[in-house]
A protein has these predicted regions:
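A structural feature that tracks compact, well-ordered secondary-structure segments
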Residues: 28, 85-105
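Amphipathic alpha-helix face/heptad-repeat signature
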Residues: 10-17, 39, 43-46, 53, ...
């Protein structure tokens, strides 16, 4: 597989991960708004899938660095993909935290 194909695969994996995180965040916000504990549970269950996507990108990136030794724009692009995946993984974790707060009653708070 060529360097270009490996970088394209990283981009595709990042896109898939971004879609998972977006679905998770939207689900967490909706669960919180609707006080839907079932939806919150579904969001928390998706976290492992997001973590797996991050680990795949991380492993593929290190393999790319070791075998292809990209330079210039290829190096910048592949490193940006790795950093973006880290931030997406963190957003996935934050959606889990939102999901965990869904069952909490906020009746003691007043507007």
């Amino acid at each position: 597989m060529s360097l270009e194909q490996k970088i394209n695969n990283l981009e595709t994996d990042l896109h898939i991960m971004g879609t998972l995180v977006l679905d998770s965040l939207v689900g967490a916000v909706r669960a919180l708004e609707d006080k839907d504990t079932l939806k919150a549970s579904e969001v928390m269950d998706k976290d492992d899938e997001i973590d797996d996507a991050y680990m795949k990108i991380d492993q593929d990136w290190f393999e790319l660095m070791a075998t292809e030794q990209p330079v210039a724009s290829d190096l910048r692009l592949s490193t940006s993909i790795l950093q973006a995946s880290l931030h997406l993984e963190r957003l996935g974790d934050l959606s889990v935290y939102l999901g965990k707060t869904t069952p909490v009653s906020y009746t003691h708070l007043r507007a």
